[in-house]
Amino acid sequence: MEGDMVAKVKRETVVACMTCPLCDKLLRDATTISECLHTFCRKCIYEKITEDEIESCPVCDIDLGGTPLEKLRPDHILQDLRAKLFPLKRKKERAPEVVSSISLPAKRKERSISSLVVSTPRVSAQAGTTGKRTKAATRKDVRGSGSFTKRTVKKEEEFGDDHVESASSPETLKKFTQNKRQSSYANPNQSLSNRRNKDVDEPWDSKLHLWKPLNFLVDVANGTKDPKSELGNASHNDVQGSKTKTKDHKRKCKLEEEISNNGDPTTSETATLKRTRRTRRKRSSTFGDSRIPLLPGAASLKQERRNGHVWFSLVASSNQEGEASLPQIPANYLRIRDGNIPVSFIQKYLMRKLDLKSEDEVEITCMGEPVIPTLQLHSLVDLWLETTSKHQRVAASIGSSAKEFVMVLVYSRKLPECNN
């Protein structure tokens, strides 16, 4: 009985639970912040964090750390409830269009295959018969072949073959019927080459290209030939023909240049030598010695480093003693987007993490030297690169640790100055 109970709830109360607080619309791709469990549309919360550069929840202002996008999680349960209670209309409208677009090509394919299979067995089945039936069959074959050859001739005329004769003309039909009658009385195992030798008066060589597409269709219907192989060979031959044409054209251009130079072969040779010398000079001037660094490239790399992110590691000093020692923070690897921020920003961050009264209680050192709080981070990175070994190369593999390539900043409690 308990499972059959139904409770009625007002629509306004359900909509309030499934509304994004940023766009005031129903949730789309519900995304929840793992720290405070507030839910938003995925597009809304991503744009809010990236464009406004906030590091806290827009509703409760809880701190999300340096990488707030990593605290976002997709809420599939809430999204499924929203889809069941308030379904989207776009899916219902697009469904019939997809079905109609897919169903059309299958029908065309079935028609084309059936037409091939039905038209092929008539010729082979009626080849050995005699009498009136053979005459009627030959007439039907002549009509069918005439219509078929009309189609092939029309296709060839579209591609520019103006010399092809249509097989539906009265002269070709008469010749075709005469050949059919002679072949019906002859031996059926006789080859096509012997028939050509007997019928010397008729120019069969001029009409062989009309029967090639018909024979190909018959072979495809019987399953003896693969249509893809023929198409592949044709395309391969076309590509080879175009390559040979381009080579011949280049050779003709070279010959014309040599002829234009008053017929002297030495002038063309000197011209080619001058060209090679010019290219060698250009290469030597542009590339130069590989050991000398290029100044414009170094300046551009330095500018990119100044505009990019700054990675560094914060490590507590090991020389601290007593109650004045500062503990190690959990997230020691940090990234700052703006390299123009001074070092005092890091001191403020440590003050918040370690619950100190002021930022002056923290002292930051790099490579054993104290760092001025007003120094900018990109300048500090340049100093760190200069103090490290310049000419030593460190081999690194993909996927290995990058601890050796990250700037290390050591923090400790600043000791009060002794006044003498």
Swiss-Prot record:
GO BP field: protein autoubiquitination; protein ubiquitination; response to water deprivation
EC number: 2.3.2.27
Tissues expressing the protein: Expressed in roots, leaves and flowers.
Pathway stated in the Swiss-Prot or TrEMBL entry: Protein modification; protein ubiquitination
Region (Disordered): 113-201, 226-289
Compositional bias of kind Basic residues: 244-253, 274-284
Positions with biased composition (Polar residues): 113-123, 166-194, 232-242, 260-273
UniProt GO molecular function: ubiquitin-protein transferase activity; zinc ion binding
Positions annotated as zinc finger (RING-type): 20-61
Gene3D superfamilies xref list: Phosphatidylinositol 3-kinase Catalytic Subunit, Chain A, domain 1 (3.10.20.90), Zinc/RING finger domain, C3HC4 (zinc finger) (3.30.40.10)
Post-translational note: Auto-ubiquitinated.
Pfam family, one: zf-C3HC4_2
Disruption phenotype: No visible phenotype. Drip1 and drip2 double mutant shows delayed growth and development, but increased tolerance to drought stress, compared to wild-type.
UniProt-listed PROSITE patterns: ZF_RING_1 (PS00518), ZF_RING_2 (PS50089)
UniProtKB keywords: Metal-binding, Transferase, Ubl conjugation, Ubl conjugation pathway, Zinc, Zinc-finger
InterPro entries in the cross-refs: DRIP-like_RAWUL (IPR044768), DRIP1-like (IPR044807), Znf_RING (IPR001841), Znf_RING/FYVE/PHD (IPR013083), Znf_RING_CS (IPR017907)
Catalytic activity: S-ubiquitinyl-[E2 ubiquitin-conjugating enzyme]-L-cysteine + [acceptor protein]-L-lysine = [E2 ubiquitin-conjugating enzyme]-L-cysteine + N(6)-ubiquitinyl-[acceptor protein]-L-lysine
Zinc among keywords: yes
Extent of Basic and acidic residues compositional bias: 154-165
Functional summary from the UniProt entry: E3 ubiquitin-protein ligase that acts as a negative regulator of the response to water stress. Mediates ubiquitination and subsequent proteasomal degradation of the drought-induced transcriptional activator DREB2A. Functionally redundant with DRIP1.
Assembly: Interacts with DREB2A.
Protein name per Swiss-Prot or TrEMBL: E3 ubiquitin protein ligase DRIP2
Gene encoding the protein: DRIP2
